[in-house]
Amino acid sequence: MTRPTRPFVSVIMPCRNEERHLDRCLESILASDYPADRMELLVVDGMSSDRTRDIVAEYARHHPVIRLLDNPRHIAPCGLNIGIQASRGEVIVRMDAHVIYLPTYLPILVQALLERGADNVGGVLETLPGADTPVARAIAIGLSHRLGVGNSYFRVGAPEPRWVDTVAFGCFRREAFERAGLFDEELVRNQDDEFNFRLIRRGGRVLLMPTARAYYVARTSLRQLWRMYFQYGYFKPLVARKVGRVMTLRQLVPSLFLTTLAACGLAAVWWRPAALAGMGIAAAYAAAVLAASAAASPRHGPRVAGALTLVFPVLHVAYGLGFLLGLRDHVLRSRPRTAELSALPMSR
């Protein structure tokens, strides 16, 4: 693309209490190879209680492309919709405050959007540890390992561009929102998955571009990781209810694993083979976790490998329990916990 033909791009960044990561994120966006006079950056703040707003305001004083908007409802989908409605761009790009973007990230996405017939294009996230501790480093490994996240291509990567069901964040044609509507504000998490499903159902296409790369800064503790993946699992049944089906089979695996173990434990009271089946399943899972963790030891050291034996179960059990409770609340009882989750950070 030559400079005059580059579309005007609106970058939308919903955030809340992101003072730790915001400087690096904003600096990376401002260093983009995409021309500054062909973009705007709308930071939509969910009424942060830390220094997030001050940081954005200071950057806005020196960089007129940045605007600070308010999101009084706190949660990410509301912030996204506020940003979209206030934006001017022909192309709308969602970005996240927990991420550091390479200078080529935005140009690659925009070019692919225009040349490949896609309605939404995303890149690949390389996961960085949020701290220099064995647990934080293990979390980063787990979030980019197939045992941890399955075939989630935007996390584990792909050798070439491919059409997918969802991507992280996304670079959209404005017409995509005219076609499919805005983000669903009932979904504290997984709102991008639901939107992409809606877009595809209306004839849109979602493309993963492996050459568009960014660095996602992961959570630093097992408690933070548990909370995040519990939320992901919790809102998946609500997404399934809205779209009329489970979007991918990998979403069912953690909850099926937990319910199978529980069923074997209960059945073992009356039928001894059930206990053996449950122990066999648990042993196979433990062997997979230990093998994956041991494989990380030569490169990352035994302390990180030891922490990884905890990271994989946290990912799977938190997601599985969240899914089961979400099934109860969103499908069986219709008692969502959106309000009590609204104060949590927005990042992936």
Regions flagged by a language model, labelled:
Residues 92:
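Short aromatic/hydrophobic "clamp" motif used to bind/position activated sugar donors
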Residues 45-54, 73, 96-99:
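A conserved acidic beta->alpha catalytic loop
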